Amino acid sequence: TFLLEMENRLNSQNIKGEDKDLPIWIPLKTIQNLYQELLESNVEIVVSAKGVKFKEKGFELSFNQLSEGYKNILIWVSDLIYRFQQSQPNISKLHDFKGIVLLDEIELHLHPIWQRRIIGQLRTFFPNIQFVFTTHSPTIIQGASEDAIIYKIFRNPKTGKTSSSEAYFKKNLDHMMLNSLATSPLFGLEDARISCKTNSVDTSD
């Protein structure tokens, strides 16, 4: 796994000392702390010679026993860090990584509370990375930063071409409740009531 590879590389660095040919790697403890923050400290991550284990409410779990939300976050965040360490090998702190990251439907398998927090958490840990998200969740929009710019992407039914709306600015949406945001032109939900029924749904946006 990514964490075990991190540990092996760090041990290799310690053995070889000040070898300038070795790339700098983010400390394993820093990565673990990042995961703990993203997982809301509900899961303890234990790295040992036997592998990586997770402890939740006193129970020891394998990776496959974690919830889909936890697994999803761990997989793509690990992949993100790994790719940045490969492309920027002399960076030793997470907040120094620079680049652009595209994430499709970040809300998948996440509880609404987590959806609202996740973008702010990522911005805190990676302030020099520009994140571009796609989402179908108004809760993700609620959690976006004040300087976020939002576009509605849609397919023109006449031409079949994909287009975008004019820009929405997050700071101009802060007054809206979640149900108001869902029924706004940005999402186009016809009615926010639970009992509302509709005969047709346009999912092309």
Model-derived features: where do they sit?
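Coupling/switch segment of ABC-type P-loop NTPase heads
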Residues: 1-36, 179, 183-188, 197
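Accessory N-terminal region flanking or inserted into the helicase ATPase core
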Residues: 23-31, 37-39, 53-65
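Short coil/loop linkers at secondary-structure junctions
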Residues: 41-42, 190
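Short beta-strand
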Residues: 43-47
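Switch/communication elements of ASCE P-loop NTPase nucleotide-binding domains
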Residues: 51-193
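Conserved helicase/translocase motor-coupling segment
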Residues: 200-205
